[in-house]
Amino acid sequence: ESILDILEVKARAGLDVRLVYDDVGCVSTLPAKFYKEIRARGIKCEVFNPFRPIVSVVLNNRDHRKIMVIDGHTGFTGGINLADEYINRKVRFGYWKDTGVMLKGEAVWNFTVMFLQMWSVLTGSTEELQVIPPYQSHSYYKEPFESDGFVQPYGDTPLDHETVGENVYLNIISQ
């Protein structure tokens, strides 16, 4: 069973399953109009920066983030791409290990907001951004989450003129 098959089962069961992919980054690995196949499976799908075979400065305008949010409570991020060559099933680029991070609890809310912000840009609708609820604990997680530190996922985008990533790094360096 592939990840796509599992997502289809969840979407058909009534869960809100959404996918955003960077078309320029997938131009050599996914079929043209891949989003139509995804939507036919009942999965909501939007394409970031649809590929157009012309030389343009927007070819470098990419969204390389990997964000997965499950139930608004568990999130995954990191550098891992979803393809056989990244799990050493197929040798294409050599062998390496990449990092993936799982977060649980309130920090995941930031991933939800980042995803919905991009979704809003791609769909042209701000409706969902107006109703993002604050983080809510789920009843099936009995134990409270505890930590010695502070986790604050953040996002940066070329779509605005704010230098969030640069500011975060400069603040860390200046500590």
What is each PLM-predicted segment?
Residues 1-175:
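Charged, low-complexity intrinsically disordered terminal segments
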